[in-house]
Amino acid sequence: KFVEITVDGEKCIINASAVQLVKPTDEGTLILFQNGAKIHTEFSFQELSNILLN
């Protein structure tokens, strides 16, 4: 499943199946992927969880 999120003001499409961990931070949410890549987004943990799980 691919989902669209905003990262640094840019729309990005990510493979939700490759997400290993979603971690809340003070500034938003950190997404860790199975390949070790990381993305920080301004979405709240709850918003991002809803996007990834729907």
Predicted regions and their residues:
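Acidic, Ser/Thr- and proline-rich intrinsically disordered linker/docking segments
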Residues: K1-I13, S17-N54
